[in-house]
From Swiss-Prot:
Active-site residues, Swiss-Prot/TrEMBL: 170
Molecular function via GO: tRNA (guanine(46)-N7)-methyltransferase activity
Keyword entries, A-Z: Methyltransferase, S-adenosyl-L-methionine, Transferase, tRNA processing
Native source species: Burkholderia pseudomallei (strain K96243)
Coiled coil: none
Bias-annotated ranges (Low complexity): 19-32
Entry protein name: tRNA (guanine-N(7)-)-methyltransferase
Domain of life: Bacteria
Amino acid sequence: MIHDDDPNAPGAPHDDDATAAPASATRAAPAAGDDDDANPLHLRRIRSFVTRAGRVSTGQRRAIDELGPRFVIPYGSAQPDWDAIFGRRAPRVLEIGFGMGASTAEIAALRPGDDFIGVEVHEPGVGALLKLIGEQQLSNIRIIQHDAVEVLAQMIAPDSLDGVHIFFPDPWHKARHHKRRLIQPPFVAQLAAHLKPGAYLHCATDWQNYAEQMLEVLSADPSLENTAQDYAPRPGYRPVTKFERRGLRLGHGVWDLVFRKKHAG
């Protein structure tokens, strides 16, 4: 995910809590030594991230130590009682790859009646979002620090999500790497299976080629329907990041896609 505090973005600031930012948390890469082209089953091993080293700042570490026990849910093979974890029954949205969490926190503050499960593998991003949770006194976010593909399979019940957010996943812009992209038919089918009928899947990217692939893959899934003719206007709840503003000023495009799960029959 590209976010306001990404130090890998052009012109991004380098402060104490930003220097450890992952470039993207929604990166699908094969394990070292895998030969995707020789193994037709490589999609079974798709990951929602790429391993990236990062330094955890003092503020992030403090947030992890102080707030982690309440807001970070350990990965496990059983489905948690999410109503009990959040202390209520409310619409539930899964965000895959929240980066440094600025957009996640802003959306959660804007939508206090909804609960958000953020999945991110990189510890600096987890610490950054926990820091925002503490500063803004947000109670409607929980975090799982693990691969989103496995989280979805093990910890999220079918037909249980009211929404899924995937903002600015790694575009893998070289043609030979397109098979590593997260938005592929098997994963989209898995996402759709965990959405309630009528629930939405919202993807955003600033790479036109990836936007075109997203549109093709999402449109081909028989359980999903597009809410727009092709690309959707940016929903008001999705913040415009500093990186995105710079890109728009330079004439770069951003594409939002919002699909809904069809009702049975």
